[in-house]
Every structure is written in C-alpha cells, then in structure tokens.
Amino acid sequence: MEALLVINAGSSSLKFQIFGIATAGLERQVRAKLDGIATQPRLKATAADGTELINRRLDATAVPDLPEALSVARDWLATLRGFDLRAIGHRVVHGGPDYVRPVLIETTVLDRLASYQDLAPLHQPNNLAPIRLAMDIKPDVPQVACFDTAFHRGRTEHTDCYALPRTFYEQGVRRYGFHGISYEYIAGRLREVAPEVARGRVIVAHLGSGASMCALKDGRSVETTMGFTALDGLPMGTRPGQLDPGVVLHLLTDQGMSAQAVSDLLYHRSGLKGLSGISNDMRELLGSDDPRASFAIDHFVHRCALDAGMLAAALGGLDAFVFTAGIGENSAPIRARVSEGLAWLGAELDPAANDAGASVISKAGSRVALHVMPTDEELMIARHTLAIIRAR
C-alpha cells in the first residue's frame, strides 16, 4: 500500500502516524506515540481497527532525548510490512515571514527554518530533527513542512504588527500566531458538520499544555492570542502567556539574570507549573486540594475569559465557541468554568451534556453554541503532504 508518514516531534514526546493513500482519499493505518522521553518512555501504537501493535515501557537511559527517540521509532517502523512510503509530512511550529503555506523541504528550506529556532526554542529544534534524520536515511522520499503560523498569515498588517518602528515589521517582528494546523482542521470540520456555525463568528480554544485561542469568521483567522512567539497569550503548562515586556527588562537589569536564564524561566518554569509550584499538568492540579493548585487554575480560567472577550470584540460578537486539544476535549471542569466566563456573551452551558462529553454542550436556547471537537493535526498534515506530492 502506498503510504504517508506524518511526524509531530516535541521535547518530551514523539507522535507519528501512517496514512494509506487510497482512491477515496487518506486512510489512517497506524497511530503511534513515544512519550515520557528521558523520564518514563513508553512506545504505544495501534492499528486502524484498534488492534494494539506495541505497548512497551523503555529504559529512560536508552531514550534520554529526542534523537534516541527517533532511533527507536525508526527501528520499530522498519518492522512494519506492506507500506510503500511515498512522502513524509512534518509539523513545524514557526514558518517565519517566508512560509505562508506548506512547502516541499529542500536544503535551502531547512536552513531557513533553522534560522527561526530562537523564535520557537521549545519546538523548532525538535521539529527539524526528524527532517534531518529522514534526509539521511531516506534521501529519495520527499518531505513536506506544514506550519503552525501559516493559517494566520492572511490577516491585515495592522492586525499583525506591533507598535514599533516599521523597520522591525519588515524584518519579521510581527504577530504570527500559532496552533494554525489545529485551527485549520477545526475550521474544515465545522464546515462539514455545522456549516451554519462555520459561516459565523467562532472562537476556537486550543487548550492543552500549549494553549491559545483563535477568532474565526467564515472559517478564516481574524485574530489570535499568540504573537511573535509561542510564549504569548494564555498561560500554559510551563509558559506564562501574556507578559508586560517591562518584566523581562526588570529581570535582565534589576535582577541581573542572563538572557538564557530568562529564556529558561519563560519557557520551562512559568505557567501552571510556576504558579502552582506543583505541576504543569491540569489533570494533576484539578485532583489536588493544595490551594496553590486552585490559584493556578483560577488564573488560567480568568485569562481564558479575558482573551475570549478580546476575540469576541474582534469578531463583532460571537455565535459559537469550540473547545479542542487535550484540556479542551477532556476536562469538563475547565470547560464549565470557561463557559461561565462567556455567560455575558449569551453562552448557557448544559452541565449534563458537558459532564457526558457531548459534542454540543450548550443548552438548546443558548445564544452562543458551545461545541467540543477533537482536533486532528496529523490528518491535516497528511492532506497537505498528499496535495503537494501529487502536484509535483
């Protein structure tokens, strides 16, 4: 079977999926994840019919980092039979000012993407590592990069810019926005299952270890909460979200911190983890009776409500609100509390539907429809990859 491999590489996990190329379109064949890199690594994979292919705990010393995780994944993939690999698609967080749509990866493209590593140090190096590996071991297999920033690139300049001298915008200092692959998938899925909603004013909340929200009008990005980097906007697992730049100046000058120390603070020691002093995992915080956990959750929900108001203003009102990603799809308590913050816009939560994990969790008469919709970034990447190799 002709197939595509889709890779989504992070610092602590590696997700990869195989899609068969059929006459009717793409058919998911294998879904795999190697998580707990360097701590409690485990490789799990299932076939399309749900059959477990592997569920193996690995020695942490054998998988201390992403390069070793990639080697483990490569070796396991080599045991699979019946797939004729036609292309590899990758999630790449930052496309900078140059890439506004998915692109076939060549050496010059890879070099350009590497130049954006300082803009996404938590993600970009990990995104590029499997590309380099595949270039070495499968040089004849085309690779495609799909960017989290691309979905937002159609916005107006006055929306994208910062109030800095124009030369900075021309040098690429602008509000890029992220999680675009997820938002693109949700926008397309809404057109399929709720076309009247898709044509309206929609806020999508991608709430996971990384979190942001996006305002959609007729399926297009109008405004989003993240900006130049994936530090901005909502508080996240280990990132602070919106922060007065004066705080950074204070840390550098008055506190005497180095730029690297500030970067480590903002990317690894802030957010839910920093506020609570307990964990970056919302599930753990919700299960804790420690007041610091409640404090972190309160802050997260407060910021969600504030940013939803900003996005509703950008849309001129609100017709629907969609929860997606790890927290959005799975945490009924967080959905309930965020929905409370939307009551002034006309959102009325149906608690029973919310607790049951229904796809629509608003009451029948709610002015704002509340939806829960699983995202599928890997499928979106596979679609773009297939389109590009067919157009060659």
From Swiss-Prot:
<dbReference type="GO" id="GO:0005829">
    <property type="term" value="C:cytosol"/>
</dbReference>
<dbReference type="InterPro" id="IPR043129">
    <property type="entry name" value="ATPase_NBD"/>
</dbReference>
<comment type="function">
    <text>Catalyzes the formation of acetyl phosphate from acetate and ATP. Can also catalyze the reverse reaction.</text>
</comment>
<dbReference type="InterPro" id="IPR000890">
    <property type="entry name" value="Aliphatic_acid_kin_short-chain"/>
</dbReference>
<keyword id="KW-0460">Magnesium</keyword>
<comment type="subunit">
    <text>Homodimer.</text>
</comment>
<dbReference type="GO" id="GO:0005524">
    <property type="term" value="F:ATP binding"/>
</dbReference>
<feature type="binding site">
    <location>
        <position position="8"/>
    </location>
    <ligand>
        <name>Mg(2+)</name>
    </ligand>
</feature>
<keyword id="KW-0614">Plasmid</keyword>
<keyword id="KW-0067">ATP-binding</keyword>
<dbReference type="GO" id="GO:0008776">
    <property type="term" value="F:acetate kinase activity"/>
</dbReference>
<dbReference type="InterPro" id="IPR004372">
    <property type="entry name" value="Ac/propionate_kinase"/>
</dbReference>
<feature type="binding site">
    <location>
        <position position="15"/>
    </location>
    <ligand>
        <name>ATP</name>
    </ligand>
</feature>
<keyword id="KW-0808">Transferase</keyword>
<feature type="site" description="Transition state stabilizer">
    <location>
        <position position="179"/>
    </location>
</feature>
<feature type="binding site">
    <location>
        <position position="91"/>
    </location>
    <ligand>
        <name>substrate</name>
    </ligand>
</feature>
<dbReference type="GO" id="GO:0006085">
    <property type="term" value="P:acetyl-CoA biosynthetic process"/>
</dbReference>
<feature type="binding site">
    <location>
        <begin position="206"/>
        <end position="210"/>
    </location>
    <ligand>
        <name>ATP</name>
    </ligand>
</feature>
<dbReference type="GO" id="GO:0006083">
    <property type="term" value="P:acetate metabolic process"/>
</dbReference>
<comment type="similarity">
    <text>Belongs to the acetokinase family.</text>
</comment>
<keyword id="KW-0479">Metal-binding</keyword>
<dbReference type="Pfam" id="PF00871">
    <property type="entry name" value="Acetate_kinase"/>
</dbReference>
<keyword id="KW-0963">Cytoplasm</keyword>
<feature type="binding site">
    <location>
        <begin position="281"/>
        <end position="283"/>
    </location>
    <ligand>
        <name>ATP</name>
    </ligand>
</feature>
<protein>
    <recommendedName>
        <fullName>Acetate kinase</fullName>
        <ecNumber>2.7.2.1</ecNumber>
    </recommendedName>
</protein>
<feature type="active site" description="Proton donor/acceptor">
    <location>
        <position position="148"/>
    </location>
</feature>
<dbReference type="GO" id="GO:0000287">
    <property type="term" value="F:magnesium ion binding"/>
</dbReference>
<comment type="pathway">
    <text>Metabolic intermediate biosynthesis; acetyl-CoA biosynthesis; acetyl-CoA from acetate: step 1/2.</text>
</comment>
<keyword id="KW-0418">Kinase</keyword>
<feature type="site" description="Transition state stabilizer">
    <location>
        <position position="239"/>
    </location>
</feature>
<feature type="binding site">
    <location>
        <begin position="326"/>
        <end position="330"/>
    </location>
    <ligand>
        <name>ATP</name>
    </ligand>
</feature>
<feature type="binding site">
    <location>
        <position position="377"/>
    </location>
    <ligand>
        <name>Mg(2+)</name>
    </ligand>
</feature>
<dbReference type="InterPro" id="IPR023865">
    <property type="entry name" value="Aliphatic_acid_kinase_CS"/>
</dbReference>
<keyword id="KW-0547">Nucleotide-binding</keyword>
